[in-house]
């Protein structure tokens, strides 16, 4: 299930975001969390409250889903190519079978290790499995397959009051959250992101 975070301030992005998803993605269940539900959004919606703690609201929204796995998304994650469904299912099976992993990021972003995940040429550890996270890029708001409960646990532990990526290092280390990222020598775009 896609799990998209958005805000009504970003409504100018909805048409291209949902349009590109429809064009390039297989039919995957989709829930959007938003500060105020909108008829412009063509899928299930859960309302969060701007004036409440961001992490608590986010984790509450996740708890409303039945699925055990979600694909973390935001309204500016535009698809430019068809989703590799077989690869997505392969990565989901890896998450299901490996208790040491909590997520697989579907893009190379940030400062990450170059240590390969055994038996997979396109998967690398965000941080080597025998090391603690030391960089804020260990958590990245990028397209990511998450074990839903681990994402809930992380947001509860981090407990940020506002939207953002800071403050996740200590909670990730405390909870033992480890993950992988996908990379197949895609072209670099900007300072830290790659095509994927």
Regions of interest found by a model, annotated:
Residues 1-69:
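N-terminal anchoring/stem segment of glycosyltransferases
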Residues 32-34, 70-72, 102-107, 145, ...:
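A structural signal for short, well-ordered beta-strand segments and their strand-loop junctions
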Residues 14-19, 55-59, 84-93, 162-171:
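Well-ordered, non-membrane alpha-helical segments in soluble/globular domains
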Residues 135-196:
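Catalytic core and acceptor-binding pocket of nucleotide-sugar-dependent glycosyltransferases
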Residues 68-80:
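Short beta-strand-to-loop acidic/aromatic patch adjacent to the donor-nucleotide binding site
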Residues 118-136:
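Short, flexible, basic/aromatic active-site loop/helix in glycosyltransferases
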Residues 82-112:
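Conserved donor-nucleotide/metal-binding helix-loop-beta segment in metal-dependent transferases, i.e.
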């Amino acid at each position: 299930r896609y799990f998209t975070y958005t805000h009504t301030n970003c409504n100018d992005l909805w048409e291209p975001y949902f349009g590109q998803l429809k064009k390039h993605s297989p039919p995957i269940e989709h829930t959007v969390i938003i500060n105020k539900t909108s008829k412009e959004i063509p899928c299930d919606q859960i309302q969060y409250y701007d004036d409440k703690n961001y992490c608590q609201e986010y984790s509450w929204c996740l708890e409303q889903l039945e699925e055990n796995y979600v694909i973390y998304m935001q309204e500016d994650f535009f698809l430019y190519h068809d989703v590799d469904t077989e690869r997505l299912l392969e990565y989901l099976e890896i998450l299901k079978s490996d208790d040491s992993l909590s997520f697989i990021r579907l893009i190379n972003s940030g400062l990450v290790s170059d240590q390969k995940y055994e038996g997979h040429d396109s998967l690398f550890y965000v941080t080597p499995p025998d090391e603690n996270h030391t960089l804020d890029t260990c958590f990245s708001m990028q397209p990511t397959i998450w074990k839903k409960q681990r994402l809930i646990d992380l947001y509860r532990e981090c407990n940020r009051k506002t939207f953002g990526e800071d403050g996740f290092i200590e909670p990730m280390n405390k909870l033992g959250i480890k993950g992988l990222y996908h990379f197949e020598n895609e072209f670099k775009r900007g300072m830290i992101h790659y095509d994927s």
